Amino acid sequence: MNSRLTTFAVVLTACSHVLAETDNPMSLAEGRVVLGIELQTRFEFRDNNFDFNSAAGTINDDSWLLNRLRLNVKVQPTPWMTFFAEGQDSQEIGSQRPDRPGALGAEGDNTFDLRQAWFELGDVKSFPLTLKAGRQVLLYGDQRLIGPLDWNNISRTFDAAKLRWHGRDGLWVDLFTSSVVVPDRGGFDESNWNSVFSGLYAHIPTLELQDTELYVLHLRDTNLGHAFFTFGTHLKSQPEALGSWDYEAEFAVQTGRAGGRDLRAFASYVEGGYTFDHPWKPRVGLEYSYGTGDGNPADGDQGAFQNLFPTNHLHYGLIDAFSWSNLHDVALHLSVKPMAKLTTSLEFHVFWLDDTADTWRRANAATPVRAANPAASNYAGSELDLTVAYTVCDSFRVMAGYSHFFAGDYLAATGASSDADFLYLMTNLKF
């Protein structure tokens, strides 16, 4: 009871500061030192999400609570120098799954560890180059290839060095090299420099119509036998540039070596939407996503698109059964804002595998849902996702969602084919 009252008091205090439009209470030394805190709690219920088999109850057919606490400090002694450090504690409570992150699908426990620690040098008002080095978040485009995976309770960061050139009118170009940080429940989270991820990424506003992004990415992983390039472009219309219409698209090709095999792969998505002139701002969108699969796992060629370091939860259904590889996904998006602080959305996805000779991989782009079966139908199933988000104040949000997966012919031909359900309720306090 006391903990609930304490939480309520913290939320009330945070919101009252915003409503009163006071200065940031976490800002010290005339803004040169800023403290931050984020507390996120998510209740989840999952049934048949991993095996699509209602006849065999597993430790993943259960409910649990995910807690995440982040504490950070930002210090800016001069306009051209910034330091930032952030610690994170992640816990999975009430689950029978292993405590180790990733084991049997578990979010796992990762007791207070260093999530970010970086410094940034440069003042764009004086010189157009800045350098950011240390443990940091990398996020580009709509996170289909590079993102922090923030839905995951531990999330993702990189030990990286990033040089950015700042041009005019929102133009910028990044050059970076990095290694992803691997969570270690029993010790300090560290990166593995046997895996090096580098890239050149440019953001180019175009004729006040769209944002155009061009990139060249390279992943070298000596443990996995990877050494390949990803060349691509991401396009997104600017707000109201086309009136009520909007669009977004991305195209990427890969070449090199993946898993010791010659890689030739492709991925793309195209989305268009229309927002009606109504106080609730209803939007209807249609999206198609495609990632190549591998037609013959036994030969020396690899045709499956390598999904790199994405946040796939945002794109291919909330149950997280798919990645941007060996995939056809047609999705209908509906959203409305009945109130300024309330957003509701409904999505319906229909999924096919690109090639049934290849594995169906989950959202982490690695874990197989089922072994390949070339003789099976490529229709995997469909998914309905309903989400509701309410912003109590700038510092506090409440979100809830329900998803149902309708099992398709591929599941029926390869084993159990029960439908799956996912339900969550999440709160996020941040200031």
Give, region by region, the residue ranges found by the protein language model.
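Outer-membrane beta-barrel transmembrane domain signature
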Residues: 325-329, 333-385, 391, 405, ...
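Outer-membrane beta-barrel "beta-signal"
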Residues: 386, 418-431
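Surface-exposed loop and membrane-interface regions of Gram-negative outer-membrane beta-barrel proteins
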Residues: 49-67, 75-127, 140-148, 186, ...
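Structural signature of outer-membrane beta-barrel domains
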Residues: 42-46, 82, 86, 90-94, ...
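Transmembrane beta-strand segments of Gram-negative outer membrane beta-barrel proteins
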Residues: 24-54, 82-85, 171, 210, ...
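Signature for the C-terminal beta-barrel architecture of outer-membrane proteins
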Residues: 127-131, 148-298, 337, 350, ...
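Outer-membrane beta-barrel biogenesis signature
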Residues: 15-39, 45, 58, 298-301, ...
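Cleavable N-terminal export/targeting peptides
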Residues: 1-23
